């Protein structure tokens, strides 16, 4: 049997909120935007959750350099990779279309009652 408490995920990726990079507000805003984009693209919740995990891991791995990256471009890349990983692929051109169409979209999730 596998033990979560001895896994690499638990040892390496579970960190306190204070350990997140300085651009935490951008990380939160990007996460909300990814949820909106994933709902608009009719992606499964598991794909969106995997994309958020990938985004957080990228932010932790990049450390203080998080501010140098375009958060929404990284978010779209995480959604694309998560869709591939969860075997729910969508072509990259469709993600780009959704992202450009909803670039200025607010973070209200009231319409997303899927």
Task: Report the location of each language-model feature.
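An acidic, Gly/Ser/Thr/Pro-rich helix-cap/linker signature
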Residues: 1-17
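Structured all-alpha helical bundle cores of eukaryotic regulatory proteins
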Residues: 22-114
């Amino acid at each position: 049997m596998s033990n979560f408490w001895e896994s690499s995920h638990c040892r390496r990726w579970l960190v306190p909120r204070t350990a997140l990079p300085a651009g935490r507000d951008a990380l939160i805003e990007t996460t909300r935007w990814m949820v909106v984009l994933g709902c608009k693209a009719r992606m499964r919740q598991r794909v969106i959750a995997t994309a958020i995990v990938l985004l957080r891991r990228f932010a932790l791995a990049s450390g203080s350099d998080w501010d140098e990256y375009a958060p929404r471009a990284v978010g779209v890349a995480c959604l694309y990779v998560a869709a591939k990983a969860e075997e729910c692929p969508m072509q990259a051109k469709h993600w780009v279309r959704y992202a450009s169409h909803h670039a200025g979209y607010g973070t209200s999730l009231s319409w997303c009652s899927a």
